A protein has these predicted regions:
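Acidic, glycine-anchored loop motifs typical of Ca2+
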Residues: 20-39
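Extracellular hydrolytic enzyme modules, especially secreted metalloproteases
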Residues: 40, 46-172
Length: 172
């Protein structure tokens, strides 16, 4: 199960730290509002073809640790699982580096961004290719103002709202 997998990884990392084989990370782990928790841990997992579907624990996703595990003396608040099969993709004989885009998509979930694609029913594309949370693509798209505002990166006052029909000029 996923819980057993995460427990095993955390136990092995802690054992390596205790034995001195790797150094514990002691700074910069609690930069959010989790008070004493590691805000996010990203696990890159080597898996074979077919082991990365949604029926198992190794598909790309964000999950809450809820303080269930302790790493470097701090509880884990959230974690991302990224299977090795999603780091590169081959299409039409070309290999594309998707690692950074998959990792950043899942990290944005840890920061609070929702998916902006449909998973059930009408599979339309609510925001198309225009937001990183709408699709994992190479190159990665930048989050829309909606997502950045939702994450608190843009103050509410800096986001104008159009309330009337008309012609508007967008200034880059």
């Amino acid at each position: 199960t996923e819980t057993e997998f995460i427990t095993e990884v955390v136990n092995q990392v802690n054992a390596l730290c205790e034995s001195g084989r790797i150094a514990a990370i002691t700074a910069g782990l609690d930069t959010g509002n989790q008070e004493g928790c590691i805000d996010n841990v990203t696990l890159l997992v080597k898996v074979g073809s077919g082991q990365d579907d949604k029926s198992g624990p190794y598909y790309p996703h964000k999950a809450d640790g809820a303080g269930q595990w302790e790493l470097f003396g701090k509880k884990v608040a959230a974690y991302n699982v990224i299977p090795s099969t999603r780091l590169w993709i081959e299409e039409n004989g070309m290999a594309y580096d998707w690692g950074y885009t998959t990792i950043s998509h899942e990290l944005l979930h840890s920061l609070g961004a929702p998916d902006l694609y449909r998973t059930t029913g009408d599979l339309g594309e609510p925001v198309g290719i225009w937001d990183h949370m709408a699709a994992v693509s190479a190159p990665a798209n930048y989050p829309l103002v909606y997502t950045r505002k939702d994450l608190g990166w843009i103050p509410e006052a800096d986001t104008p709202v159009v309330t009337q029909s008309g012609d508007y000029t967008l200034v880059p």
